Amino acid sequence: AGRSYIEHIPAAAIQEQLAAGRFTSSTDFSGIRRMDAVIICVPTPLNKNREPDISYILKSGEAILPHVHQGLLVVLESTTYPGTTDEDLRAVLERSGLKAGVDFHLAFSPEREDPGNPDSKVALIPKVVGGLTPACAQRAVELYSTAIKTIIPVSSCRAAEATKLLENIFRGVNIALVNELKQVYAAMGIDVWEVINAAKTKPFGYMPFYPGPGLGGHCIPIDPFYLTWKAREYGQNTKFIELAGEVNTAMPMYVVHRTQEALNAKKKAINGSRILILGLA
């Protein structure tokens, strides 16, 4: 007990909360009957066809289902497409015979964290909250206000779901842009890092992004495709997002190509060469 499997949450923090009686862990879902609120934060990967896989969300709903009771607040935090909370999760929970927004509360509040940044504290990161009804939203605001300084209510679960997607798509698209510029400027003999450092001195209308060997992490390479998939249901094309995905996906091969060029300049083959990678995380 007290061991953390999340890299940026030290075991000492878990042990401190355990000792203070503020945290307990259990695999017994019947305890939900004594709870005022349940927060679902499970993975939302893509399947082999690069389509959304919300099975972890639905299975969580099914685990909660037998224990849904009057007044319970259920909040989904997993990044997903608009409509997951008020359509898919709601349908599972209402099999209890209780009605969302009437008998129990349902809301969505996207997870926000900055892993790897020791100065980032969840309590200080504004929290977006959207409810199925105004009363649902108010209950979620009350819950999160006990731990987080600033709460940002929005009009619906869908607006909150779309907010998270916008945040991650914004990052993915801008990384793709600078990855493409990296290749263009390299061909011109221009140092893209020098250009970025000069551009970021502009105090308005610019935000620096940096090139790299593709996208990393659990979110940015995946989340944009949740929206591209859902958009097709509405007859909409997301060409910009999909093009950004293509650019970022191609970056590892660009790095290999540049490495090959550097070795060739030294009359060495990439096969059999020993290569030091700095900054690998």
Residue ranges and their predicted role:
Residues 1-281:
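Structural/interface elements that position substrates and couple domains in central-metabolism enzymes
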